[in-house]
């Protein structure tokens, strides 16, 4: 994957090889992690720590219909598609996925009209992990391919623990 930024957005370009695309869960809030999807994990201030039911970090699950889902503070899945612009194209077995993301701080409040994205600038340090969930036809996700190595425990803990994210330094 590649990352660039402007003062108002983070841009990510991902390339994946997948011979079978699956989106069997039509309700975007149900088992969204078990369909083919791009996951982008962002910790605005690289503070690490738990973000399972808070916004210390976001775990955007980008579906094949370009919706962005994460778990809210009420412990239920929510659409955060208003944070993300997502488009993908398929070329044979190759998937090219382009994403533009508004970055929010950990004081984000679900449902509030007062949430404002943070401004990005050179030198800012953020936490980032990118993963692809792959399902080739079973009921559950078959593969989780991530950008960061998880040394011990379950390998898919990025949706809980921002301490697993890599360090992203915004450079000029």
Predicted segment positions?
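Structural preference for beta-rich elements and adjacent junctions enriched in aromatics
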Residues: 1-172
């Amino acid at each position: 994957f590649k990352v660039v930024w402007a003062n108002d957005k983070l841009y990510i370009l991902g390339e994946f090889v997948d011979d079978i695309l699956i989106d069997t869960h039509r309700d975007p809030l149900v088992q969204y992690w078990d369909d083919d999807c791009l996951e982008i994990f962002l910790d605005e201030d690289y503070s690490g720590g738990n973000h399972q039911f808070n916004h210390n970090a976001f775990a955007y699950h980008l579906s094949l219909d370009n919706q962005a889902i994460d778990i809210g503070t009420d412990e239920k899945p929510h659409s955060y598609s208003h944070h993300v612009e997502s488009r993908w194209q398929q070329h044979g077995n190759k998937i090219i996925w382009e994403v533009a993301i508004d970055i929010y701080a950990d004081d984000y409040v679900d449902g509030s009209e007062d949430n404002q994205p943070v401004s990005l600038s050179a030198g800012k340090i953020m936490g980032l992990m990118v993963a692809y969930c792959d399902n080739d036809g079973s009921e559950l996700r078959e593969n989780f391919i991530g950008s960061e190595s998880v040394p011990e425990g379950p390998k898919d803990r990025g949706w809980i623990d921002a301490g697993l994210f890599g360090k992203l330094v915004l450079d000029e």
